[in-house]
Each structure stands twice: as C-alpha cells, then as structure tokens.
Curated annotation (Swiss-Prot):
Keyword annotations of the record: Cobalamin biosynthesis, Methyltransferase, S-adenosyl-L-methionine, Transferase
Reactions this protein catalyses: Co-precorrin-5B + S-adenosyl-L-methionine = Co-precorrin-6A + S-adenosyl-L-homocysteine
MF annotations from Gene Ontology: cobalt-precorrin-5B C1-methyltransferase activity
Top-rank EC class of the record's enzyme: transferase
This protein's name: Cobalt-precorrin-5B C(1)-methyltransferase
Residues annotated as transmembrane: none
Disulphide linkage map: none
Name of encoding gene: cbiD
GO BP of this protein: anaerobic cobalamin biosynthetic process; methylation
Lineage, uppermost ranks: Bacteria, Bacillati, Cyanobacteriota, Cyanophyceae, Synechococcales
Family: Belongs to the CbiD family.
Enzyme Commission identifier(s): 2.1.1.195
Pfam families: CbiD
Length: 381
C-alpha cells in the first residue's frame, strides 16, 4: 500500500499537471524525488487534463495514508498549473519562502495561518515541490501552482488546527514522505531505536526533547531547540519516558500542544484519542482544584472539546486559563516522574512546556521553565 503523507500526494498532482502542460503524456503514476538524495517513490495519479485551450492544466490525486482513522485518508487533491514567460529561475527567495520562479497559492481547503494569511506548509513540502517541478520548467518561465482540497475545510474542523492558529483547511506540514503510524507498535519500536541511537552518540550531553506530532516538531524548530536532541514521539509517551531513563537521559523536555499533553496530567500515557481521551474530565478536575467558580466548571464539563472549553474561559475569565494551564504543566511533570519511577529508579529531570492556539510558548512546569531558560527562551506573557 502507498502510505505517504499529504504533501507527497500534493506534489504528485502538481507534477502530473505540469507534465501534461508541457506536452508529456499522462501517466497514472508519477516518480517523486525526495530531498537529501533519498530514493524516489512512485505515487498514483487519478487524472490529469489541459484547461483553457492548453493555457492551464489540472491533475487530481487521492491521499492514501494507509491509516483507517487518519484525517487525510482519501482526501482529494486538485493541482492547477499555469506557466508564465519571463519568470526568474534563480535560487532567490520571496516572502512566503518559495523561490521566485514558483508562485504557490493555497486554494480552498488548504490551511493558512490566521495571523498572516500565509499557507501552512512545511519546509519538507516546499522542498518537495521545488525538487520535482524545477526540472520540468521551460527555460525563462515561472510556474503558478494552486492547490485545492475540496474536503479540506470540513476535514480540518475535526482536527486541532485552529488551536495552532491555522484556519480554512488542512495543513501541509508533513516532514517526511512515508507515514508514521503514531499508535502502532512498529512506530514505538522505531522511535525507541532512534532514541537509543541519539543517546549512544559521542556528542550526546544527556538532554532530549520529546515533541508531539508535526505541529510540535514545526514549533520546536522555529524556536531553535537543538535539532540533534529532538525526537517526535507520536502517541507512545509512557514507554518512551521509561526508555529515555533507561538510556541515561538526564534532562527531558516534553514540548507540545496542550490538547495532547493534558492527558499526561491526568495519568493517561498513551495519547491517541481513539484509545484514550478523558481531556474534558481532566480539565474539569484541575479547574476544581484551582478553585475556579462552579459556573465555569460546569461550562467546561459540558464543552464538546478542550478547544471550545478554552475559548469559553478565555472570553469569560482569562486569569482562570492561566491558573489551569500552569497547574497542568506542573502536574505533567509530577505524573511523568511518577510513571517512570513505577518501572525503575531514575533521577531524570522531566520538564513540560505547552504552547497555545497562537503557537506561542505560554505555560511551563518548574523544570520546563528551567530548561527553556537555559536555552535563552522565555514564555509569552
């Protein structure tokens, strides 16, 4: 089965449409070259056609993540391509991070940052587009790429995108070609192997950062956390905490969106929502312990999601939000240490840092605060 991330299917559609536009025959599979000289992959294409008397082209692909419950599974992708003469083909960059020969448009259903209106697209996805489209570009031409995800807006409403400041659709934030199944035993095995490898390196200084998912990885890199210390964990946090202690980690930072890490504060250490949730219940419990008014506690308990509960609190009582999440960050550290010490005696220091819906580091436990301060980072107030 072709288990590729959404950016791969987007680039495959764009490449197919470009091939048709420059006169090449339609192929039901496109060869996609990967960054860093990795081997290329073959990606199925549904259809491709010329439009407007050959002035534009359109290709369609369907994302096959291989995961039955993945939000991008089966998503239809439309890639519109148009070439223009007189474009520049240098390596210069424009404001949105693309080379000046590539005019990228996030169409309907593609996520955009609410603050800037710019497309939410990872560097991996940008590189993938450039690597695969540039060789097809006629000399002296530039290319306009518009991506549309007809179901993107509806699918995104079932995610936490808005909590990261991303609106209007699905993010194109994959950091690799192949899908990592975050709740599978194979993913745990692979992550443990990566952890052991990092801890065995001569330059290892005893410090690691666990980031949760693609958004966590994206923000960790933007904040300048040491890349050689970062591991994307997926959902197997409990076993990985123990593995970190077993491999001699001295300082561990848990860095992520509160929607995932909230579960740790309630003692839930496998965080995939199909296996364990309880976030509203945990949030309600913490609000009670912090002495939040009964009316607000009742609103929280009846919320349909953590995000909605937060929005309610932010409007009605911003001070309560700060109290709840500060307590939560501390509880994450306490519960995580207790979890590790259930299985082995360890002096590993565990810190937690949570970011908010505006993609800002907002809350940290005492150990988390020490660790980010040592890196020259401060919390947003």
């Amino acid at each position: 089965m072709n288990q590729f991330t959404l950016p791969v299917w987007v680039v495959a559609a764009a490449k197919s449409a470009t091939n048709i536009l420059i006169g090449n025959k339609f192929r039901d599979k496109e060869r996609i070259d990967l960054p860093n000289n990795e081997k290329s992959i073959s990606v199925p294409i549904s259809s491709s056609a010329l439009l407007d008397n050959g002035k534009r082209s359109l290709a369609v692909s369907h994302c096959q993540s291989g995961l039955p419950l993945d939000i991008t599974r089966g998503v239809e992708i439309w890639a519109y391509i148009q070439l223009s003469k007189g474009g520049f083909q240098s390596k210069g960059k424009v404001r949105n991070g693309f080379p000046d020969w590539l005019d990228f448009h996030a169409g309907y259903g593609v996520g955009k940052f609410q603050s800037s209106g710019q497309p939410c697209i990872s560097q991996f996805a940008r590189d993938l587009l450039c690597i695969n489209l540039y060789p097809l570009l006629p000399k002296g031409s530039s290319i306009k790429v518009e991506i549309i995800l007809p179901e993107g807006k509806d699918r995104a409403s079932k995610t936490s995108n808005e909590a990261f400041g991303v609106v209007d659709g699905l993010s194109l934030i994959g950091t690799q070609a192949e899908v990592q199944i975050s709740a599978s035993p194979d993913q745990l095995k692979n992550t443990k192997e990566l952890l052991h490898h990092k801890c065995s390196e001569a330059k290892f200084d005893g410090c690691l950062t666990f980031v949760i998912g693609e958004n966590g990885m994206d923000l960790a890199m933007k904040y300048g956390l040491p890349a050689n210390q970062i591991i994307k964990t997926g959902n197997w946090l409990g076993p990985l905490l123990v593995a970190a202690a077993e491999n001699g980690v001295k300082k561990l930072l848990l860095f992520g969106y509160h929607g995932k890490l909230i579960k740790l504060s309630g003692g839930v250490f496998h965080t995939h929502h199909h296996l364990a949730d309880g976030r509203i219940e945990i949030l309600t419990s913490i609000a009670f312990r912090e002495g939040i008014s009964f009316d607000l506690i009742e609103l929280i308990s009846k919320s349909t999601s953590v995000e909605n509960a937060l929005l309610t609190l932010e409007v009605s009582n911003p001070e309560a939000v700060s109290l709840i999440w500060s307590r939560m960050a501390k509880e994450i550290e306490i519960k995580s240490r207790s979890y590790v010490n259930r299985y082995l005696s360890s002096s590993m220091e565990i810190g937690s840092v949570l970011f908010d819906r505006k993609r800002q580091m907002r809350w940290a436990g005492l150990e988390g605060l020490k660790q980010i301060n040592s890196l020259g980072l401060i919390l947003k107030r």
